[in-house]
């Protein structure tokens, strides 16, 4: 027999979800979302999903080998399906506020002795399973360094070199400092893996798990996306 199930699902925006990523380190993401989806599946028909799921907000604390804890804030974003569930497209932003960062490696001038906060902005795009991750640095609105030409120029220069940007992001996450051109704490491969996979894999994994839980609840476990 050929059985086909066609469902229209409205995800409840008031639903709050906790996703345990690692029981040993205590990595948990808390999030909220909503959306309207059409899901079709049959005994002779592959799973098809169409529609958009919106992430309204979320929180995540990244534990690096249980020694470092770094709080991330998930901004609003979307996951869009046009049929094949594995080809979902994401568009999402996250940020991490690094506090009291040593700025000495950014400038040889008066800013050498300054410490200040800096925001790491991360944008995720492309495939849900393998997102593209780009970074950007932003100084808080009240930061005195916003008027420092050398510091702002250095931060802007990082944008033009993906490897350098990833290296600086990794250094901020682990050591709360920028590193100079002469320092080489990370190999290129490890740096890219730490900076992009830390955020990209975690967030894409969370998005997948979050949606899958909503889907299983809506269909009483009949349909899941894995």
Regions from the PLM with identified roles:
Residues 1-226:
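Interface/linker segment at the passenger-translocator junction
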